[in-house]
Regions:
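Short, acidic loop-to-helix structural element flanking the phosphoryl-transfer center
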Residues: 64, 68-69, 87-127
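Residues at secondary-structure transition points
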Residues: 38, 62-66, 159, 163
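Active-site loop signature of alpha/beta-hydrolase-fold enzymes
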Residues: 14, 109, 210
Length: 213
């Protein structure tokens, strides 16, 4: 009997694209940002990464705050750092709320359905591992018609730890101790590095990174 093969996917950013979030900023503020010499895509990334960082640290502090709430105060920071004298006058609260709510509408990354189909055809069992809240991320998968069974969907809140704590990845590896292959797929370098240290073979940025125990 052939040894089992498993691949664990990060979800938001890896299987689910940030495009809806980026498009919301472009739609409501793109022209205005360009008029002040601020590249919209740079601003989008600053807001996204700033919000994600604040959310991560709030989880570590055991005071988790949803991204959609965290993004509102974070939104004004890169505006101020870009030279906008009155960030709260530069953009209306309604625009910030619209952008924050767009994070609920994230869709599938192009090619992910074919990717998972080919993996299954080659004998892989697909798992999801997310640091996002379970209901929201499962909602993304359902809306995008990405089929990952509920028993294969693991949220960090179910483990009692958060990425990139080693306990998260060790928890996953314990689910298939006799696997012939265990892979981890993520677009975030910090996530991939933590998985590698825990014993996974990585797939990230189109490169295979050797397993190291």
């Amino acid at each position: 009997m052939a040894a089992s093969k498993h691949i664990v996917f990060d979800i938001v950013g890896t299987c689910i694209s940030y495009d809806a979030f980026f498009n919301a900023i472009e739609e409501h503020l793109g022209d205005k940002l360009r008029q002040h010499g601020i590249p919209p895509r740079l601003f989008e990334l600053l807001v996204l990464e700033g919000g994600e960082r604040e959310c991560l640290f709030s989880k570590i502090a055991r005071h988790s705050i949803p991204f959609m709430e965290m993004i509102k105060p974070v939104f004004y920071r890169p505006l101020a750092m870009s030279g906008i004298e009155n960030p709260h006058e530069f953009t209306a609260d309604e625009d910030v709320t619209y952008v924050a709510e767009s994070y609920r509408r994230l869709g599938a990354r192009p090619g992910i359905h074919e990717c998972m189909r080919r993996l299954r055809e080659n004998g892989f069992t697909i798992w999801a591992l997310t640091s996002g809240d379970k209901a929201r991320v499962q909602g993304y998968l359902k809306a995008a018609d990405i089929d990952i069974p509920s028993e294969n969907f693991i949220a960090c809140e179910m483990i009692g730890a958060t990425k990139p704590e080693p306990e998260v990845y060790e928890h996953m590896l314990k689910r298939f101790p006799d696997a012939g292959e265990t892979w981890f797929a993520a677009c975030h370098m910090w996530d991939a590095a933590a998985a590698k240290r825990s014993g996974c073979v990585l797939y990230t940025d189109n490169h295979t990174i050797a397993q190291k125990r």
